[in-house]
Amino acid sequence: PTRPMSQCSGMIFTNEAGDIYIATVGYFGFNPANKKCGFICIPKGATEFDTNRSWDISTTAIEGFEYKAASVFSAQYVGNNKVVAYVGIHELASQNPYTAKSALAVLIDLHAKTIKKIEGIPLTDGHSISINKVGTNAVFGAFGTDKVGLFSFDPATGAVQQLLSTQGNPAYF
């Protein structure tokens, strides 16, 4: 259901209540017949998925963007039932999925079931999708068309700052 790669280590997490969430990738957004993706939840103390708290995000509009998510490429829990993620946008995929700028940085609210585009982080390819936490901020690696490097996002304020520029693909950090 998820990606076993180090840059995607945030795809399984627990919230403050001890509930387990698992992000699902949904064919990486490459199968237009099945774009289901999102989060499945096992509440603390339970052994089964809770269908009321699990969520197929492919049906949810992204605030500030014209398309919906077709995949969760990477995710990082930032607290208060919020997740930052790179989601794959099927409509932006090209003939070459390795270089297509089809990954969008978003803020996801698991409680309200909303998704918002993070302004200031460029669209990136499916390999430059690392997200880590530094203190209370999330740091995204992005290989954009006009900007390349590491970008800090403050989930409390929504502020984005480019921390450094890189030559080439910032796939891991």
Predicted regions, residues:
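Residue-level recognition of short loop/turn positions
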Residues: 17, 111-112, 156-157
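Loop/turn-rich, solvent-exposed surfaces of beta-rich toroidal or solenoidal domains
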Residues: 66-143
